[in-house]
């Protein structure tokens, strides 16, 4: 498996993973628009197939992780962990020393991953998510 920077050519495949993983997924156009602006994405790839991705909007010295997803059949292979770790490394190399994110309060696998990578809970956004309605934990990492 390799982790590399996402390109616009990856947007359709990434959007398909997004659709499999989220109730309100970004579209292919949403990903290409993000890449045109201040977003940076990494993809995990094996045998020319994208297995997962992580995205972040960057305003140095801060970043906000927008999405982390791994194809359901490839979970439990530490792909999400590797993606977040590479994003943290990239961040430090590019002057980003603080990353924030929101995660569904009931998404314990993701919360555990973030905590393992050094993120701490800052607070809660009530009813942040829709379909289904759920609170979001706000988490932060300081590099």
Where are these regions (language model features)?
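Non-catalytic, surface-exposed connector residues within folded enzymatic/regulatory domains
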Residues: 25, 77-78, 132-133
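Glycine-centered loop/turn positions within well-structured domains
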Residues: 63, 77, 137
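Short, P/G- and charge-enriched loop/turn segments at secondary-structure junctions
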Residues: 30, 125-126
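C-terminal "cap" of GNAT-fold acetyltransferases
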Residues: 41, 97, 104-108, 127-143
